[in-house]
Design a protein with these regions (language model features):
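Structural/interface elements that position substrates and couple domains in central-metabolism enzymes
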Residues: 33, 37-487
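Intrinsically disordered, low-complexity proline-rich regions
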Residues: 1-45, 367
């Protein structure tokens, strides 16, 4: 069920710690027939814990504190907690450090490793990672269960009333029901809801404060659903007053919303990359094709840029976990197409490796190659499943002398890939290079002067793995320029 009362999603400046309430929700929209909640709902700011202070949890904690809630961030990593309490961001995310330091200064945000501190808080939000299993494709739920187990002894103690456990981590369908049973078996009266996140790295603060939709997965019982919804409505009160669309359903629906969204986005990316493969065989221009089909309002232009493929900690993992879970449930055939989505994505990375070999005359041995980009996307330092690092490592492993540069991820490269050289900027990386590859579309790489860069390389060969440069300008400057599915 969707709750909405207008079409204007605009909200006021989040720095004011409140949002506009000029657009209210239509009271005729209700989740279920009226029920009297047993949970007491605080009038005003809620007391919220976030369990897990990585990328998702830390951003959520600081953002919730910035709109007036009292927030405690919990994590087992003492150094991370110490840094966060000092206002030091453990990752690169535009706008996060400012929100973090302001929330700390307000006194509404603190971080701790002691789960006993959670006893005074009413809403507990699970934000831990669910990585791919080491020996399989499914999601590893170790951290989710550990977080809930650590919280259970401290639930039912909040003076504000009945507690609510909220899942935001991306999990296989059926996980919420297992956790609900875990709470019941432990004898706690705590409610459970699922509230999937839809954050984009590079836009995480904006996506938390100005979400394009909010999804609740609620218990089946009418009274418990009403109680859980009342507490969540208070958490998201500023956003709901600003007419953010609200979609409600049961646990499996909410769990499936997130993996379905990510699978659709991955499918769209792999589709245009498959078209790029056909263009490379026929002389077609995938960029023109993407523009033309993107003008169809049933399709839209987003996620239609061909390139070296997608990466990160979500899309690759989520489509594999979705397929694995569907197989466990006997519905594997329904998602068999996602296997090809994954294969197309991996094939594009190998295509760049093969194109590099071709441009270098058939051998990588001793060849100097510059790779521009290491993070899986711009405005992030996240190198998980990074296409850029995959390609760089493949080239290095086949005998090339590879130098990588990234505006935010250089330190991660030094730590994670010590076999790769690291440069501070594109010109340093490209010095005496025989091939330059652009694999993460940072603005500073898109704005490179082809004439100036040609002055520092040994051979003017360039692969634009993100289709973000002007082919004519680079060729006019004397480069052997190649891109993905463009003539």
């Amino acid at each position: 069920m969707r709750v909405r009362s207008g079409d204007d999603p605009a909200v006021d400046d989040p720095e004011n710690s409140t949002f506009s309430n000029r657009v209210g929700r239509d009271p005729s929209h209700r989740l279920r027939p009226a029920a009297t909640p047993r949970a007491r709902v605080r009038s005003g700011p809620m007391r919220i814990t976030t369990v897990g202070c990585g990328y998702l949890g830390a951003v959520y904690a600081a953002s919730m504190a910035s709109i007036g809630h009292e927030v405690l961030g919990l994590d087992v990593d003492q150094k991370k907690i110490d840094d966060l309490n000092k206002g030091i961001a453990p990752f690169h995310e535009p706008g996060f450090e400012k929100v973090l330091t302001e929330a700390l200064a307000s006194g509404r945000l603190r971080f701790s490793t002691d789960y006993a501190d959670a006893a005074d808080y009413q809403v507990h939000v699970i934000c831990v990672g669910t990585p791919q299993q080491i020996n399989g494709s499914g999601a590893d739920l170790t951290y989710v269960h550990a977080a809930v187990d650590a919280l259970i002894p401290h639930l039912d103690k909040c003076p504000d009333g009945r507690s609510l456990l909220v899942g935001r981590s991306t999990v296989p369908v059926g996980t919420a029901q297992i956790l609900a049973q875990k709470l019941k078996d432990a004898g706690t009266d705590t409610l459970l809801a699922w509230n999937p996140e839809f954050l984009r790295e590079g836009f995480a603060v904006k996506d938390t404060l100005y979400p394009d939709r909010i999804v609740y997965g609620l218990p089946d019982g009418e009274a418990e659903a009403a109680e859980a919804k009342a507490l969540l409505d208070e958490v998201y009160k500023p956003m709901l007053k600003a007419d953010t669309p609200l979609v409600t359903g049961n646990y499996p629906t909410a769990e499936l919303v997130k993996v379905s969204a990510n699978s659709f986005l991955a499918t769209k990316i792999s589709f245009i990359n498959a078209v790029a493969e056909v263009c490379e065989a026929t002389g077609g221009d995938v960029s023109v094709i993407a523009e033309a089909i993107g003008l169809d309002d049933r399709i839209g232009p987003k996620f239609l840029r061909a390139g070296v493929g997608f990466g990160g900690g979500c899309l690759p993992k989520d489509i594999r976990a979705f397929m694995a879970r569907a197989g466990e449930l006997g519905a594997g055939e329904a998602l068999s197409f996602l296997r090809e989505v994954d294969m197309v994505n991996n094939r594009r990375r190998d295509h760049v490796v093969n194109l590099s070999r071709e441009m270098l005359g058939g051998s990588f041995t001793g060849k100097r190659i510059a790779v521009l980009g290491a993070a899986f996307k711009p405005d992030s330092d996240d190198t998980r499943q990074s296409p850029a690092l995959y390609v760089a490592s493949k080239l290095s492993g086949r005998g090339a002398d590879v130098t990588v540069t990234d505006p935010a991820a250089n330190e991660r490269v030094r730590t994670e890939r010590p076999n790769l050289k690291v440069a501070e900027d594109a010109f340093e990386a490209a010095k005496d290079a025989e091939l330059v590859l652009l694999l993460t579309e940072w603005d500073e790489f898109k704005e490179l002067d082809p004439v100036a860069l040609k002055e520092v390389v040994a051979e003017a060969r360039f692969i634009d793995g993100r289709n973000v440069l002007n082919p004519a300008a680079w060729r006019e400057a004397g480069w052997d320029y190649r891109s993905m599915g463009r003539p």
